Structure formats: C-alpha cells, structure tokens
Amino acid sequence: MWTFERMKRVILILLGLLLAFFAFLAWYKATYSMDVVSERSSGPEDAAQRVLVATQGSTYKDLVTDHVIGHLTDQSIAVQVVDVTMLGSVDASPFDAVVILHTWENWEPQPDAQAFLNAHPDRTRFVVLATSGGGDEMIEGVDGISSASVMDEAQADADNLIARLDRVLARGRAPVSPSSR
C-alpha cells in the first residue's frame, strides 16, 4: 500500500531524475552546439577564381577553415566565408568551388548543408568536411572527408581538404547551379 510519504518520495525522485535529464540536455547543447560564423571575405576582389566556404563555429572547424583560407589567399583566390545556416540564401553560381564544413547532428548531416547539396545534384565543385563523434559519417555522393574533430589532426585534415579543393580548382570553371525543381 502506498502511503503519502512513499508517494512523496517517489515523486521527488522522479522530479530529480527529470531535472537531471534537462540539466544534461542543457550541458550537452552548451558543450557541443556550433557557434555561428560571421560572414567575411578575403583575397583579391578581382581574382580569377572564387571559393565559397560554408562552415560552423568550433575550435576545430575554425582552425581547418583558417588553413584553407590561408592556402587560397596565398594563391590569390577570392574567398567568401558564410555560416552553414546561410546556405539556403547563397547563390553558388559565381563560385568555382564550394567547401562545406559541417557537423552531424542527431545522426544526420546538418540540415542546411544537406538541403544545399540536395539542391545541387552536380556536386563536382563541392568538397565537404563532415565531423561526427566517431569521425565516420559522410554525406553520400560528394567528395570529402570525415573527422572526429581531433585537434591534433586538424592540420592533416585541412591538408586533405585542400588537396581535394586544389583538384576541383585545377579542373577549371563549370557552372554550379541548383536543380530545376
């Protein structure tokens, strides 16, 4: 038989567990959510080649992005950097290549990155770096690499991404246009 004291204790335990669960969710979001990246440009405005870099803010992605931008500006290539969440409003056609650095969220690619790639079935101009907890998740049908955001591997991952990007840029310019749906 349930006494008032026993019911009270069970309710307090359940409330405590619920509170702990929500505290965990808040901690997880604060620890693992991506920062928003400020839009910026670098390189000469009259450059022969232009690259769009869409990324999310994290220490690892910032380091990889900085390496990519440094490499491109050293080659006098214009670079436009936007947050991945802005991809829906970006026209990819003026760019010779598009680099997307995104994280997997809830076992799926970042929604804006996936929607942008879905809108561009010819992905020959795209290079993607996908980060996930295990470093093994990747969007199918696009050139790129996957990483677990290990800081000690950021330079090697950036070099890998740059090598892929250089191959895209060496092929020359072809139109990058969304699918006609």
Question: In which residue ranges do the predicted regions lie?
Answer:
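Surface-exposed acidic loop/strand-edge motifs in secreted or periplasmic proteins
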Residues: 68, 82, 102
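FMN-binding flavodoxin-like domain, especially the glycine-rich phosphate-binding loop
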Residues: 21-48, 74-75, 102, 108-181
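A short, well-structured beta->alpha microelement
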Residues: 75-91
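Short, charged N-terminal beta->alpha structural module
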Residues: 47-78
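Hydrophobic membrane-insertion alpha-helices, especially the h-region
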Residues: 8-27
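Structural motif
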Residues: 97-99
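Short, Lys/Arg-rich N-terminal segment immediately upstream of the first membrane anchor
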Residues: 1-7
